[in-house]
Amino acid sequence: MANKDHSLDEKIIEAARNEFLEVGYRNASMRKIAARAGITTGALYTRYENKDVLFASLVYETGLLFEKEFSALKPEHYRIAIREGKFSQLTAHEAGKILDIIYDHFDECYLLFCCSEGSTAEKYYPLLVRSKAKQTARFMNSNGMAIPVETVEMLMAAQYSYYIEVLKRRYTKEQATELIRNVMTFSDAGWLALINDKL
């Protein structure tokens, strides 16, 4: 069996990234990606079983970064922050970390959150929000705040949609930081009002 020509991998990744960024997953074509990379469609399928596998290879590592960041912030961190009056400082820290990931991996984030319709990666964002919402609802309920997980999930979906808007509008990091700071001021006030009402 002939050895795979790994020198083509970079060309394929670059071609795929550009194709998906320009037309999205649904409208992207393996034939066009192969042509962009200067290889045959057969050579492309030798490396990637299908379009979905190729798309996933571009966004998988970035998805892991978000999961790692979200799992690092434990419920007890919120408990302490609320008790010490530092809730806004904690959410600002989390927002900063999310923006760091976005702007360190902008194209990959744009693909994952704005171009993934029709791919298996399309499910990533709602699953991420649902997981975060369940974690938050468990924390709130365990601390005497009877808030349905559905309520938390809707609030979380609205909150994280700010970041998708930043991506869609292609703001600079400086612009995004200022915008997110403003909307988090609004969001934090709502969360604290809800928390205090339920305590």
Set out the residue ranges of the language-model regions.
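N-terminal intrinsically disordered/low-complexity leader segments
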Residues: M1-K4
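Helix-turn-helix
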Residues: K11, A15, E19-V53, S57
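Alpha-helical DNA-contacting segments of helix-turn-helix folds
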Residues: A56-T62, Y124
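Hydrophobic alpha-helical connector segments
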Residues: S57, S71-Y103
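Short, solvent-exposed beta-strand-terminating loops
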Residues: E61-L73
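Amphipathic alpha-helical packing segments from all-alpha helical-bundle domains
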Residues: K97-D104, E117-N143, E150-A157
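C-terminal peripheral helix-coil segments that are non-catalytic and often amphipathic
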Residues: D104, K134, R138, V152-L199
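Short, hydrophobic secondary-structure boundary micro-motifs
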Residues: Y110-F113
